[in-house]
Amino acid sequence: LAIKDSIDYGFTTEQQIKSVLKKKGLFPEGKSLKDINVRSIEKILAQYPFIKNAECYITSGNKVNIEIYQRIPVIRVISDNGDNYYIDDEGKVMDYTDQAVHVAIATGFIDRKFAQNELYELGKYIRTNPFWKSQVEQIHVTPKKEIEIVPRVGDQILFLGKIDDYTENFSKLQK
């Protein structure tokens, strides 16, 4: 059993996976190979909210391998309507967890459609840009859907304006 990205993201533990499979009677340990249904294991694990993909197969040495890839959060959303969730690297909503995740937090007037589209794109941009990833602490969305950035360092609030101009505005700020 291997959780491929467990160093960076700890949403899923080996113990949790074993527990899920044991409850469903699918944990392979102690079973003969003919009694192990790898597709059922994959199907059950795919239903787990923090798993992006699970691959289960039997090796040429007759061992059962389970490889798990976790969903990767891009941005955390805490909206004015009380919603609290993550958007993952595919633009899908992930339930909030107490697990510490180092991503920018988006607050303010945010509905799910806006979060899964515009904020998702902004979050991806920040996450893949080393400079902005280290600088952006919070993204605030005003009632007019304008973006304000709260940096990790300093007391300033950076007003970016409408979200469709963010790449140009970030480039200007970085110079």
Protein language model regions, located:
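Extracytoplasmic segments of membrane-associated envelope/inner-membrane machinery
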Residues: E67-P143
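Ser/Thr/Pro/Gly-rich low-complexity linker/stalk segments immediately outside membranes or between
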Residues: L1-I3
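Beta-strand secondary-structure signal
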Residues: N65-E67, E148
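Short, well-structured beta-strand/strand-turn elements
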Residues: A46-N62
